[in-house]
């Protein structure tokens, strides 16, 4: 079966009940994919619960929280050609992995399939679905709209492409980390295509702090500018965040600015401009989204 070629990788930290629910759904999938859980240093008995209730799951234990970078450890452990990336509060719809693998098999230069995400008990469409579906980028021979973004819980990637691009950045940890990976895949010639028939269900954990997540996203947007974008863009984004923090005196923007500046030396040491064609695509998307 095609679906034996995909491993589901889940990163988690201190969300034992939600993770167990997710693993119940994943274990019941008709595709029966191998599952790797990477535990980001949980202290709530997560590892013991996985061992007891899901002995078939491969468990990777990290000593501390590495954020989204932890997924890289799971991808390295995978022995399949493709990897399906999941959160501890999301799961794939039956048949979704079969469809994703078939698309990747039929398009050998495709690096990643971005799926569609349905949120909560009501299956509300995530707003990103419409954004990806309306991408203005030229599609070419791809099986769906060509995009430069995806949700981390709704992606099926070619394992070799994921690893060649460096996976998820350790510097960014969490909060918009998919953006940098999408850019780096494109820079290596591995496009991403959106497929509305590859469906994920996401029930966001109540333990998520929306203000903290917003600060992380703002911080990482600035850092990505310094990591990959032209100098003028990086300066403009940093200036915007500094002005917002000074004007609003909001703890969210202030924290984002402080963390961005703290991590700026590390970002500069990793700075690598994107190919002109990828930068042009990013600018096209930015102009389209601003319209």
What is each of the regions a protein language model found here?
Residues 24-33:
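Short, acidic, metal-binding catalytic loop of nucleotide-sugar glycosyltransferases
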Residues 25, 39-48, 90-93:
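A conserved acidic beta->alpha catalytic loop
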Residues 61-78, 99:
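Glycine-rich, basic loop-to-helix element that forms the pyrophosphate-binding segment
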Residues 83:
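Short aromatic/hydrophobic "clamp" motif used to bind/position activated sugar donors
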Residues 94-127:
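Conserved donor NDP-sugar-binding/catalytic core segment of glycosyltransferases
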Residues 115, 130-147:
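Short, flexible, basic/aromatic active-site loop/helix in glycosyltransferases
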Residues 149-157, 161-166, 171-199:
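A short, conserved alpha-helix in the catalytic core of glycosyltransferases
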Residues 216-217, 230-291:
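Non-catalytic, C-terminal membrane-associated alpha-helical segments of glycosyltransferases
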């Amino acid at each position: 079966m095609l679906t034996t070629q995909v491993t589901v990788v889940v990163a988690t930290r201190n969300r034992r009940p939600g993770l167990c629910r997710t693993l119940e759904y994943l274990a019941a999938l008709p595709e029966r994919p191998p599952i790797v859980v990477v535990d980001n240093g949980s202290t709530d008995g997560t590892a013991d619960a996985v061992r007891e209730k899901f002995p078939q799951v491969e468990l990777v234990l990290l000593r501390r929280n590495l954020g989204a970078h932890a997924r890289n450890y799971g991808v390295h452990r995978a022995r399949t050609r493709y990897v399906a990336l999941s959160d501890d509060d999301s799961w794939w719809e039956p048949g979704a992995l079969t469809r994703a693998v078939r698309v990747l098999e039929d398009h050998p230069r495709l690096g990643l399939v971005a799926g569609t995400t349905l949120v909560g008990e009501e299956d509300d469409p995530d707003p990103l679905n419409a954004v990806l579906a309306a991408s203005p980028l030229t599609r070419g021979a791809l099986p769906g709209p060509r995009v430069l973004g995806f949700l981390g819980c709704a992606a099926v990637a070619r394992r070799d492409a994921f690893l060649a691009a460096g996976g998820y950045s350790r510097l960014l940890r969490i909060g918009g980390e998919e953006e940098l990976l999408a850019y780096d895949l494109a820079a290596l010639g591995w496009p991403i295509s959106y497929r509305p028939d590859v469906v994920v269900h996401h029930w966001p954990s109540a333990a998520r702090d929306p203000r903290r997540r917003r600060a992380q996203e703002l911080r990482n947007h600035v850092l990505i500018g310094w990591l990959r974008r032209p100098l003028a863009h990086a300066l403009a984004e940093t200036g915007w965040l500094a002005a917002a923090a000074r004007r609003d005196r909001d703890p969210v923007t202030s924290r984002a600015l402080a963390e961005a500046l703290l991590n700026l030396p590390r970002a500069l040491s990793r700075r690598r401009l994107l190919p002109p064609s990828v930068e042009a695509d990013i600018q096209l998307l930015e102009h389209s989204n601003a319209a």
